[in-house]
């Protein structure tokens, strides 16, 4: 489709984005930017998690470094995040005075009782990185994941950086761009990513190694609410399957139905808050809501679970939040 597209001496090969499925508009915009050598200082890749935003960002930077062509050496360095001119910023947990990236938290046993954040000191590091001269690339490259997880101070610092972008290239990957400051969105070139059809999802999942995708589809066939939660996102389905498997079997069985007595509610609140990390608890709420919505149950129950989610996100003590919510659900 894009083979041979060239302008100003830069030819963009089709193979560069061959792994990106179901995103023709986003792919066309990125190919045109490379082919015309007209890059914005900041991009906002918006759309659901798990539909190719991160992959597109990596291939876009690879195209920049490789003159529009697939560049295996640069690809490896970018994917391993060890390129000297790449800074990858993601939400962090504050653990014993250290900031632990979300991607590393589980492997080193960091508690995830509270949601991770993009912090002011991370944005300051980002600004310093973009201000320095790149070592091997035409410009400094920054990928910022989940910018909607920024606190107010971090968001204001990022806005100041966007007002004076210098010669760097910043890519924001956001599943909730509406939660960003309007002034941040307006200073970025938006590239929208959409949900995939089920056929496209199956094609993507079938290419995963070790039959991971096939196993996920088998589980989703037995539990269709997982496919509904994924809503056109292969990556989201894999994450829902991971979270499903991470919940202890005995607790998962008890979560199949809402409690009917105060004793059941209090016992379930205790076990959920003690046995599950914060991200697992939020997932249980989403899973419950999907089941309740499918069953056309009372809307007040869905609203009560919405309040529970907000309480957990606002750092209310988890056991107390679950006790209040589950007791209220008995009479709903």
Give the residues covered by each predicted segment:
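Conserved Walker B
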Residues: 146-150, 165, 177
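Conserved alpha-helical scaffold flanking the Walker A/P-loop in AAA+ ATPase domains
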Residues: 29-34, 99, 103-141, 149, ...
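Conserved ASCE/P-loop NTPase catalytic core
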Residues: 40-46, 83-91, 133
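Conserved D-loop-proximal element of ABC-family nucleotide-binding domains
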Residues: 151-153, 182
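Charged, glycine-rich active-site and insertion segments that engage polyanionic ligands
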Residues: 2-78, 131, 167-169, 174-332
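Structural recognition of the conserved hydrophobic beta-strand(s) that form the central parallel beta-sheet
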Residues: 142-145, 158, 168-175
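AAA+/P-loop NTPase substrate/partner-engagement loops
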Residues: 72-98, 178
């Amino acid at each position: 489709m894009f083979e041979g597209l060239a302008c100003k001496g830069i030819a963009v090969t089709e193979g560069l984005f061959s792994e990106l499925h179901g995103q023709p508009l986003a792919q066309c915009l990125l190919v045109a930017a490379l082919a015309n050598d007209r890059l914005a200082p900041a991009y906002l890749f918006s759309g659901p998690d798990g539909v190719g935003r991160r992959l597109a960002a990596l291939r876009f930077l690879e195209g920049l470094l490789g003159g529009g062509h697939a560049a295996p050496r640069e690809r490896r360095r970018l994917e391993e995040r060890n390129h000297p001119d790449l800074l990858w910023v993601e939400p962090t947990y504050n653990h014993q005075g250290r900031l632990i990236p979300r991607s590393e938290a589980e492997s080193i046993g960091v508690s995830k009782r509270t949601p991770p954040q993009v912090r002011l000191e991370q944005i300051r590091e980002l600004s310093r990185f973009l201000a320095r001269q790149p070592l091997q690339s035409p410009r400094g490259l920054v990928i910022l994941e989940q910018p909607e997880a920024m606190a107010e101070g971090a968001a204001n610092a990022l806005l100041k950086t966007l007002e004076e972008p210098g010669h760097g290239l910043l890519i924001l990957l956001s599943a909730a761009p509406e939660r960003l400051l309007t002034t941040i969105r307006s200073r970025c070139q938006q590239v929208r990513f959409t949900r995939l059809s089920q056929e496209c999802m199956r094609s993507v999942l079938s290419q995963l190694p070790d039959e991971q995708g096939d196993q996920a589809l088998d589980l989703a066939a037995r539990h269709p609410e997982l496919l509904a939660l994924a809503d056109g996102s292969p990556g989201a389905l894999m994450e829902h399957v991971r979270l499903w498997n991470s919940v202890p079997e005995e607790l998962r069985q008890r979560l199949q139905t809402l409690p009917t007595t105060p004793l059941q509610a209090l016992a379930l609140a205790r076990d959920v808050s003690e046995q599950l990390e914060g991200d697992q608890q939020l997932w249980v709420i989403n899973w419950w809501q999907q089941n309740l919505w499918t069953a056309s149950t009372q809307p007040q129950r869905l609203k009560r679970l919405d309040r529970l989610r907000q309480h957990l996100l606002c750092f209310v003590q988890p056991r107390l939040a679950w006790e209040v919510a589950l007791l209220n659900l008995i009479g709903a």
